[in-house]
């Protein structure tokens, strides 16, 4: 029988390191709550980034997924995770920096019915052409369910990467800094609304699940966290269009107090005519336009 999460970490002398952005969760009830929020189906193929001491890992495995692949960069955690694997052979452990792995580099083939086969090759950036090729695929052999307590310092970057590979994902249930979750879920004309809100809401359905107090972690961070669930939309825009939206929103929100006709005039010389055609008030500021408004502008460019 496995020891408690905290005792297991102590036995292996695994203490959180700042350089890895580690804040461990020892509360098994919180881990269970996160997994319940994901509505994880049996026989799912799950991906977890940064399992650390394995609290969330255990909660996922108790739901009997077909496989759970964990990506961990901290060598100190590997013996601990391997002990969990002795009880759950459907656990696959990959030592790697999560920022060096794309979902398309995780093969759909199952190795001996356990986890994903990771093709050890240099991780390639998502280019327009490559992403479009992915999006145009007629059939995808597998989809992954992502459940993770993401390190604050890489959380937003990982989310943006995964959005561009959303066709490979069933859902994402993520713990992030509360401020980031509020930005993801923000509606137009609010302070938190920005580029991240626009891009996310064009690609996924967003749902904030619950807040997590700093006291839930060891050591306690200085800020609150929150759980957000992201479910890819069936008919999301192409990567080419999303890249245009990124370009437009970068300019628009750089001067969020400027009127949109001023912010975009260098990118769209006939911006007044475009806004008139789309029936968008040209006195609006960046925060007043809905995600679909930005998409409609991108479609005209």
From Swiss-Prot:
InterPro entries, A to Z: KsgA/Erm, RPE2, rRNA_Ade_diMease-like_C, rRNA_Ade_Mease_Trfase_CS, rRNA_Ade_methylase_Trfase_N, rRNA_adenine_dimethylase, SAM-dependent_MTases_sf
Reactions performed catalytically: adenosine(1518)/adenosine(1519) in 16S rRNA + 4 S-adenosyl-L-methionine = N(6)-dimethyladenosine(1518)/N(6)-dimethyladenosine(1519) in 16S rRNA + 4 S-adenosyl-L-homocysteine + 4 H(+)
Amino acids binding S-adenosyl-L-methionine: 23, 25, 50, 72, 97, 149
Pfam families referenced in this protein's UniProt entry, alphabetically: RrnaAD (PF00398)
Major localization class: cytoplasm
Class in the EC hierarchy, top level: transferase
One annotated GO molecular function: RNA binding
EC number: 2.1.1.182
Record-linked HAMAP family: 16SrRNA_methyltr_A
Family: Belongs to the class I-like SAM-binding methyltransferase superfamily. rRNA adenine N(6)-methyltransferase family. RsmA subfamily.
Protein name stated in the entry: Ribosomal RNA small subunit methyltransferase A
Organism in which the protein naturally occurs: Rickettsia africae (strain ESF-5)
């Amino acid at each position: 029988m496995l020891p408690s999460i905290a005792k297991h970490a102590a036995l292996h002398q695994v203490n959180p390191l700042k350089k890895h952005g580690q804040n461990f969760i020892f509360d098994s009830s919180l881990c269970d709550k996160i997994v319940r929020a994901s509505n994880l189906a049996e026989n799912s193929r799950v991906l977890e980034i940064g399992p650390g001491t394995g609290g969330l890992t255990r909660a996922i495995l108790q739901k009997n997924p077909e496989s759970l692949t964990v990506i961990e960069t901290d060598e100190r955690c590997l013996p601990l995770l391997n002990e969990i694997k002795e009880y759950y052979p459907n656990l696959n452990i990959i030592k790697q920096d999560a920022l060096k792995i794309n979902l398309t580099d995780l093969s759909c083939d199952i190795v001996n019915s356990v986890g994903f086969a990771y093709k050890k090759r240099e991780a390639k950036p998502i280019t327009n052409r490559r992403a479009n090729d992915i999006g145009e695929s007629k059939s995808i052999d597998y989809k992954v369910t992502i459940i993770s307590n993401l390190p604050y310092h890489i959380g937003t970057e990982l989310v943006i990467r995964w959005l561009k590979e959303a066709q490979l994902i069933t859902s994402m249930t993520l713990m992030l800094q509360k401020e980031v979750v509020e930005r993801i879920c923000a509606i137009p004309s609010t302070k938190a609304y920005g580029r991240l809100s626009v891009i996310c809401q064009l690609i996924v359905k967003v749902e904030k699940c619950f807040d997590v107090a700093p006291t839930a972690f060891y050591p306690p961070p200085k800020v609150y966290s929150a759980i957000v669930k992201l479910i890819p939309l069936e008919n999301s825009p192409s990567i080419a269009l999303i890249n245009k939206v990124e370009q437009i929103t970068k300019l628009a929100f750089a001067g969020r107090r400027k009127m949109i006709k001023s912010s975009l005039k260098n990118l769209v010389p006939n911006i007044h005519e475009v806004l008139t055609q789309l029936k968008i008030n040209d006195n609006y500021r960046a925060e007043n336009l809905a995600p679909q408004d930005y998409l409609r502008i991108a479609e005209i460019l």
